[in-house]
Regions:
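Non-catalytic, mostly N-terminal accessory regions of nucleic-acid modification and defense proteins
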Residues: 1-219, 277-286, 291, 386-390, ...
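A conserved structural/catalytic subdomain of Rossmann-like adenosyl-cofactor enzymes
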Residues: 4, 290, 294-518
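N-terminal hydrophobic or amphipathic segments with adjacent small-residue motifs
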Residues: 29, 229-231, 259, 347, ...
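A generic secondary-structure signal for well-formed alpha-helical elements
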Residues: 40-53, 194, 223, 247, ...
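Short small-residue beta-strand/loop micro-motif enriched in glycine and branched aliphatics
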Residues: 195-198, 250-251, 424-425
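Conserved S-adenosyl-L-methionine
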Residues: 201-302, 307-316, 322-325, 336-337, ...
Length: 518
């Protein structure tokens, strides 16, 4: 599908979202809109899959379920249901498909009860199956009784019906071979648009595509194919999907604390065509309840919440993730708790890249102890990349990317890149353009030194700076100003004073001519 048609799908979906906006917050109408889009996608996907499975039987999915029941029909129905659950993870009976709901809408029926049952039936179809964890509670955030949808039941039914009818008019391209790229791209666009309007909440579920691209490119360098990729604070899963796509990862793993965002991440995986058996997204607090034990991964990426609080409980002094660093990360700034957690899950030949506030580079006390441990004792720090300010939704603070490897050699240097001035301002947001991303990735790949942009610092140099990683200590971006000619400035001032005197006299003459002064 051409870029023009992709943009058309984006615009159509965003227009549908605006039908729901009303008095809702950006995050509220996001979950309704994306949930309905996902429901339509699942419906179209299973109808196509079932029809393909029934080609030899010369009957369609809907026709089969409309037939009068007998033993042969029931056996064929059960066979189709089993085949669907085993291959795509779920099942929807024809009368609960999106298309069946819209047919009811056109008959002016109240569709909220059957829509609610339809969403529940999708989840229930996976009970006891391998896909249960990926579908359980998936639609729990779609509350069709919510007053946000309208004051009365009729108001709610009218609004939801209008949204579903608008979606019904949009071709998702499920019949096309490139379906995943088309709808996946549109879904990502929708999430980014919601993030733009969500303010501070945006950081909870979305990493800008430009930053995701840098992280993904870095962790996949040197790997023709990743076995797996992991994000401990995965949000909507966009960063995970980008890394998995670039690295051709076989499996995707993530954890997300917010239950609503966790549902969004699972939807995002399925809608991008990731088979239920190839991803595992867990709901829970990564630091307090690690869902992945001692599992290690080829690539680890993350955009953890900046300077979040955590318990820093005494029990963590005996936790293998944190115990060797000498100190726990402070209770009010968990940045290094996330970093140590990620390193624990990184395998010996892997690469980890995460976003963090600049404070992690220079703050002292416990964080200084941990930073020194990672540099002096472990030699894990591979690169520090300074990003422009105001590139994340909801915060204008400058950020950096930290890159870690466990397989560094003793004499390896640490690469510092100052990309803080490379951006394009678009309205109130700064954006990294493709050439800026390429420059960062190329500089990292080649480990190049570029004047006023990058520097390779020896471990000795870092030690002499007391393990302070603040980028200006290593990359001199100072621009000398041209020397000022004092005598020329004085001469110019005198000439301006003469001109001012002449103008005063000229103005006074005009005022006299007008009789305004004597």
């Amino acid at each position: 599908m051409s870029e023009e048609l992709q943009q058309k799908l984006r615009d159509q979906l965003w227009e549908v979202a605006n039908k729901l906006r009303g008095n809702m917050s950006a995050s509220d109408f996001m979950y309704f809109t994306l949930g309905f889009i996902f429901y339509k996608y699942l419906s179209e996907k299973i109808e196509k899959h079932a029809n393909d499975a029934l080609v030899d039987d010369e009957v369609t999915f809907k026709e089969l379920w409309a037939m009068e029941k007998d033993t042969d029909i029931e056996e064929l129905q059960e066979s189709v249901k089993t085949e669907c659950i085993e291959n795509i993870g779920y099942f929807i009976e024809p009368n609960f498909l999106f298309s069946s709901i819209t047919e009811s809408i056109k008959k002016k029926e109240n569709i909220l009860p059957i829509l609610e049952r339809s969403l529940k039936r999708i989840e229930d179809s996976t009970l006891g199956q391998d896909s249960e964890e990926d579908f359980g509670g998936l639609f729990s955030d779609i509350d069709l009784a919510s007053p946000k949808l309208g004051k009365t039941a009729d108001d709610k039914n009218t609004l939801v019906s209008n949204v579903l009818l608008a979606l019904d008019d949009i071709d998702f391209g499920v019949e096309a071979s490139q379906e995943i790229d088309i709808l996946g791209d549109a879904y990502e666009y929708m999430i980014s648009q919601f993030a733009a309007g969500a303010g501070k909440k945006a950081g909870e579920f979305y990493t800008p595509q430009e930053v995701s691209r840098i992280l993904a490119e870095i962790v996949t360098l040197g790997h023709a194919r990743l076995r797996n990729v992991y994000d401990p604070t995965c949000g909507s899963g966009s960063l995970l999907l980008r890394a998995a796509s670039i690295g051709h990862a076989n499996e995707i793993f993530g954890q997300e604390k917010n239950p609503t965002t966790y549902n969004l991440a699972r939807m995002n995986m399925l809608l991008h065509g990731i088979k239920f058996s190839n991803f595992r997204i867990e709901n829970g607090d990564t630091l307090e309840a690690d869902a992945f034990g001692d599992t290690q991964f080829d690539a680890v990426v993350a955009n953890p919440p900046f300077s979040a609080e955590w318990s820093a409980a005494d029990k963590f002094n005996n936790d293998d993730r944190f115990s060797k660093a000498g100190r726990l990360a402070p209770r009010k700034t968990a940045d290094y708790a996330f970093i140590l957690h990620m390193l624990y899950h990184l395998n010996e030949g892997g690469t980890m890249a995460c976003v963090a506030p600049h404070g992690v580079l220079f703050r002292g006390n416990a964080e200084g102890v941990i930073r020194r441990f990672l540099i002096e004792k472990k030699n894990y720090v591979d690169a520090i990349i300074g990003l422009p300010a105001n590139i994340f939704y909801g915060t204008s603070i400058p950020t950096c990317i930290l890159v870690f490897k466990k397989c560094r050699k003793e004499d390896d240097s640490i690469l510092f890149i100052d990309a803080s001035k490379d951006f394009e301002k678009i309205k109130t947001q700064n954006k990294l353009r493709p050439q800026h991303i390429l420059k960062i990735v190329d500089t990292y790949r080649e480990r190049k030194e570029i004047e006023k942009y990058s520097h390779l610092a020896t471990l000795q140099e870092v030690a002499e700076n007391d393990y302070n990683l603040n980028i200006p200590r290593y990359v001199d971006t100072f621009e000398e100003e041209e020397p000022i000619d004092i005598h020329a400035v004085i001469k110019e001032i005198k000439e301006l004073e003469v001109k001012r005197t002449d103008l005063d006299k000229e103005i006074e003459g005009y005022l006299k001519e007008l009789g305004l002064v004597e």
